[in-house]
A protein has these predicted regions:
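Membrane-interfacial segments
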Residues: 30-34, 70-75, 97-102, 135-140
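Short, highly charged, low-complexity non-transmembrane loops/tails of multi-pass membrane proteins
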Residues: 40-42, 138-144
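C-terminal TM-helix exit segments that contain a strictly Trp-centered aromatic cap at the helix terminus
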Residues: 19-31, 53-54, 86-101, 117
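Hydrophobic transmembrane helix segments
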Residues: 14-59
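Alpha-helical membrane-associated segments of multi-pass integral membrane proteins
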Residues: 7-16, 91-96, 101-139
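Loop-to-transmembrane helix junctions at the membrane interface
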Residues: 59-94
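Alpha-helical transmembrane segments and their helix-start/interface "positive-inside/aromatic belt" motifs
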Residues: 2-14, 71-80
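Cytoplasmic juxtamembrane interface segments
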Residues: 1-2, 46-72, 130-140
Length: 144
């Protein structure tokens, strides 16, 4: 397993495990932010963030591994990270627009929702990207 494929496999497994721990650690940290209003909504948002961390900790290495099996460069790695960030960002935007339309603008509550639902999965993907960036060598520079 000393070859480049072995390093990539170990990098994918390590990225998944470390990103899972980082994401759940952030969820535990954000739980300490006070919740104003209905605590059921706060608990549901925290559960969404925690489940998103679990999903992205598993799905991320699969997507990164598939992408890097096709093109092993850092641009492809960045593209895969952007693709992985689209669903949590879209979910947050949809929920924030719906909340603002029906209940009004509540900055503190919406900021907490951002912290609980988007930050943990985004941190999970970021940790995976940074670990795999160490495994994938930079592109060789072209000299004239």
């Amino acid at each position: 397993m000393a070859g480049p494929d072995g390093r990539l496999l170990l990098g994918l497994l390590g990225a998944g495990a470390l990103s899972f721990l980082a994401g759940l650690g952030l969820v535990q940290l954000i739980e300490r932010v006070p919740c104003h209003g209905e605590t059921l909504v706060c608990n549901i948002n925290q559960a969404i963030g925690a489940y998103a961390v679990v999903i992205w900790a598993i799905l991320g290495p699969l997507i990164f591994g598939l992408t890097l099996s096709i093109a092993r460069n850092r641009k492809a790695l960045l593209g895969a990270a952007m693709v992985l960030l689209v669903p949590p960002v879209a979910f947050l935007l949809i929920t924030q627009i719906e909340h603002t339309l029906y209940l009004g603008f509540e900055p503190q509550r919406q900021f907490r929702t951002f912290l609980v639902t988007l930050a943990p999965p985004a941190l999970t993907v970021l940790v995976q990207y940074l670990i795999l960036r160490l495994v994938v060598p930079p592109a060789p520079e072209l000299s004239p």
